[in-house]
Amino acid sequence: CAPITFGAHSFVGPQFKAYTVQHPLDAEERNAWYERALPITVGDNCWFGGNVTVLPGVTIGDNCVIGANSLVTKDIPDNSLVVGSPAKVVRQITEADKLGLKELLG
């Protein structure tokens, strides 16, 4: 096993999955039960939509949003909006994305 680490204030939707075990492609190694585990690290303030899958060895930066049904196979930089299978960075999350709810709700 390898650790799965979440930063502060990160949330996951229903059916979130994170896999740390990596199996070899080579049949001989696989039949001998060789495998390894790679850690998964999630930064602060991340949000994962429903049915997201994260594969072994991935690091997700701070302040990321991962859209529903995404398959995360590679590292994701800070402040990224990510969607798809395989998941791709669509754009960076900026100050313009704030809804101003804090001010509206007082």
Please name every model-derived segment:
Residues 1-58, 93-94, 99:
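Flexible, glycine/small-residue-enriched loop-and-beta-strand segment within the central core
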Residues 2-4, 70, 78-80, 88:
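Glycine-centered loop/turn positions within well-structured domains
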Residues 16, 54, 70-72, 87:
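Short coil-to-beta-strand initiation/turn motif
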Residues 47, 65-67, 71:
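A generic "structured core" feature
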Residues 61-64, 77-79:
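Conserved catalytic segment of ABC-fold P-loop ATPases
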Residues 74, 91:
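Short helix N-cap motif at coil->helix boundaries in the Bergerat
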Residues 99-106:
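Acidic/histidine-enriched, glycine/proline-rich intrinsically disordered or flexible terminal extensions
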